[in-house]
């Protein structure tokens, strides 16, 4: 069973996925990206950080399930990551997630969101300047227009509630 978790940057997708790992057994799909590694990120766990040339080589060799440009960097999911038994969770950028869900109805899409004030606070805490935050908020509002295309919508106002809602979704679908 493949779950795609998406939402605007800063809504807590990584935090939710990390907390899910304390409650359920799943394989997390590690994506490739060309963006610089943040201080708190771990190579091979959060992302595989690669060059533009390496990313293009993966595309040329048809190793990517999906890929998108976001914020001036590329993000992509290797095909090898979905060939797993059990529960697989993908953390994808909204455009890539939307395209992938349209091309494969077997995947389950979960859109994560938070209110604007909290999103701005999180972006500020990451050290972004006002111009960057303004651009991200415009992008977030554009991405939210796609939230109705997902199987589930989770408002992440409280981490435990959001995690429990996702666990409930996974358990319900596993029983079917």
Go through each PLM region and give its residues.
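Hydrophobic anchor at the beta1->P-loop junction of P-loop NTPases
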Residues: 5
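P-loop (Walker A) phosphate-binding loop of NTP-binding proteins
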Residues: 8
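ATP-binding Walker
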Residues: 11
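Walker A/P-loop
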Residues: 14
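Post-Walker A helix-loop "phosphate-sensing" segment adjacent to the P-loop in P-loop NTPases
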Residues: 22-30
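ATP-dependent small-molecule kinase phosphotransfer cores
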Residues: 33-88, 95
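Conserved phosphate-donor/acceptor-positioning beta-strand/loop module used by diverse small-molecule
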Residues: 89-92, 102-126, 155
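Small-molecule kinase domains that catalyze NTP-dependent phosphoryl transfer to phosphate-bearing small molecules
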Residues: 128-169
């Amino acid at each position: 069973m493949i779950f795609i978790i998406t939402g605007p940057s800063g809504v807590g997708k990584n935090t939710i996925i990390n907390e899910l790992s304390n409650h359920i057994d799943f394989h997390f799909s590690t994506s490739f990206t060309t963006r610089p590694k943040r201080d708190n990120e771990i190579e091979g766990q959060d992302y595989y950080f690669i060059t533009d040339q390496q990313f293009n080589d993966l595309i040329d060799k048809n190793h990517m399930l999906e890929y998108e440009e976001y914020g001036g960097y590329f993000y992509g999911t290797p095909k090898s990551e979905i060939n797993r038994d059990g529960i697989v969770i993908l953390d994808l950028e909204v455009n890539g997630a939307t395209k992938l869900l349209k091309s494969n109805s077997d995947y389950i899409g979960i859109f994560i969101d938070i209110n604007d004030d909290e999103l701005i606070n999180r972006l500020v805490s990451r050290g972004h300047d006002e111009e960057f935050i303004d651009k991200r908020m415009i992008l977030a509002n554009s991405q939210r227009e796609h939230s109705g295309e997902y199987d589930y919508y989770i408002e992440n106002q409280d981490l435990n509630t959001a995690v429990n809602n996702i666990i409930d979704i996974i358990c319900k679908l596993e029983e079917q």
